[in-house]
Amino acid sequence: MKIFRSIDITRKQITSIALEILVLLPCLFVFVSAHSLAQDTRYNDNESASSPVGEVSLVIGKAFLSSANMRGLRVRSGDFIREGDTIRTESNGHVHVRFIDEAVLSVRPRSELQVLAYRFDEANPENSLVKLNLLEGTARTVSGEAAKTARERFRLNTPIAAIGVRGTDFVVSATADSLKALVNDGAIVVAPFSTQCLQGGTGPCNFNSVELGGGSMQILE
C-alpha cells in the first residue's frame, strides 16, 4: 500500500523560498567559479612558478599543456610557456609558440615536445641556453637570437639523436626508433646518442655527426 503525505504550502511560504533561492544562486555561482579556477593552475598565484619563456600564438584543434604543477590543460592562444612545460597535440592539433628571443616553434599533429630549458640572456646572448626534447611527432623550429648567438648551447633531443643548429629553420619528425630532418635554411648537426653524445648534454655533438644544409634531408634509424 502506498501512502501519500500532503503538504500545504501557502503563497507567502512559496515567495519566501523563491527569495532564498535568488539570494543563494550568486553565492553558488561564485563558489563554483572559484573552485574551477583553483583546479586550473594557470589562474593560481604561484610564486614558485618560473618566468614565462614564450607565448602560444596559435592553436588549431586539440592540444594540451602539462608541467610539474599542471596536468593536461587545453592549450589556448595567449597561454604562457615556461621551462619544464610539455606540449602534446592530438591528430588535429597544431600549436605555434613565440619565445622571448623571437624564436618560433611549431608543434604539429600527434606530437609531444618538452621545453627543458630556455634561458635568453639579452645582455650577454652568448650565455643563453636552449634545450628542447621532441618525444614523438613533428616540430619545426625557426631560430631566435639565443640559438643564433649561442650555437654551442642549443640542443633539440629526439629519442635516438641530438640536433644542434647553425642559425636555422628546420623540421624534425621523430619516433622511438627513427628520425627524419629537413633543413629549410641554415644548417643542423645530427648525431646519434652514444657514450660521446649523451642526452643530458647541451649543444651539438661532433662525434659520428652529420651536418645538413638548406634543402637537404636526413633519415636515421
PLM region spans:
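N-terminal secretory signal peptides that target proteins for export/translocation
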Residues: 1-16
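Bacterial N-terminal signal peptides
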Residues: 18-31
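Flexible, surface-exposed loop/linker segments and immediately adjacent secondary-structure boundaries
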Residues: 36-95, 99-221
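Generic detector of N-terminal low-structure segments
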Residues: 6, 31-33
